UniProtKB/Swiss-Prot annotation:
Organism in which the protein naturally occurs: Bacillus velezensis (strain DSM 23117 / BGSC 10A6 / LMG 26770 / FZB42)
Keyword Ribonucleoprotein recorded: yes
Gene: rplF
Name the record gives this protein: Large ribosomal subunit protein uL6
Protein role: This protein binds to the 23S rRNA, and is important in its secondary structure. It is located near the subunit interface in the base of the L7/L12 stalk, and near the tRNA binding site of the peptidyltransferase center.
Similarity annotation: Belongs to the universal ribosomal protein uL6 family.
Assembly and binders: Part of the 50S ribosomal subunit.
Length: 179
């Protein structure tokens, strides 16, 4: 049995989970609504505000899907109840972030400012010129948008300049030594 898959998933108050045909699960909560279709072999049950995921056999594919399905359901429930956020820091002289309407405008050493338009359901906040926070209900999309922002100018190993995740440690390298 999968250690993750066999865990029961309690549904918090204020969150409703509906199981539709074709193994499609819709989760609704105070922060929003998420819908996802899961593999037809996975059996998802809702009993007394508890979600359980069972697998039909011990085949390698089913074992892998079991834990994955349980984790994705857990992320959906957590997303609509609490939400997810990912913080980014801008390190470098003159590196700034600003919000222009719905867009994020980054000045990170290029000859032009870089504009990033978030997807629907994703919110970008700029608490200070060197900090950016990506918020949303879908953990996967929040992480993807944060990765796209980081990819604009990923941290370089010599001076450490660039956009990094909050708390990320950039491995530094020594420069060339003169003869």
């Amino acid at each position: 049995m999968s250690r993750v898959g066999k865990k029961l998933l309690e549904i918090p108050s204020g969150v409703t989970v509906t199981l539709n045909e074709g193994n499609t699960v819709a989760v609704k909560g105070p922060k929003g609504e998420l819908t996802r279709t899961f593999h037809p072999d996975m059996e998802i049950k809702i009993e007394d505000n508890v979600l359980t995921v069972t697998r039909p056999s011990d085949h390698k594919e089913h074992r892998a899907l079991h834990g994955t399905t349980r984790s994705l359901l857990g992320n959906m429930v957590e997303g609509v109840s609490k939400g997810f956020e990912r913080g980014l820091e801008l390190v470098g002289v003159g590196y700034r972030a600003a919000k222009s309407g719905n867009k994020l405008v980054l000045n990170v050493g290029y000859s032009h400012p870089v504009e990033i338009v978030p997807e629907e359901g994703i919110e970008i906040e700029v608490p200070s010129q060197t900090k950016v926070v990506v918020k949303g209900t879908d953990k996967e999309r929040v992480g993807a948008i944060a990765a796209n922002i980081r990819a604009v100018r990923s941290p370089e190993p010599y001076k450490g300049k660039g956009i990094r995740y909050e708390g990320e440690v950039v491995r530094r390298k020594e420069g060339k030594s003169a003869k």
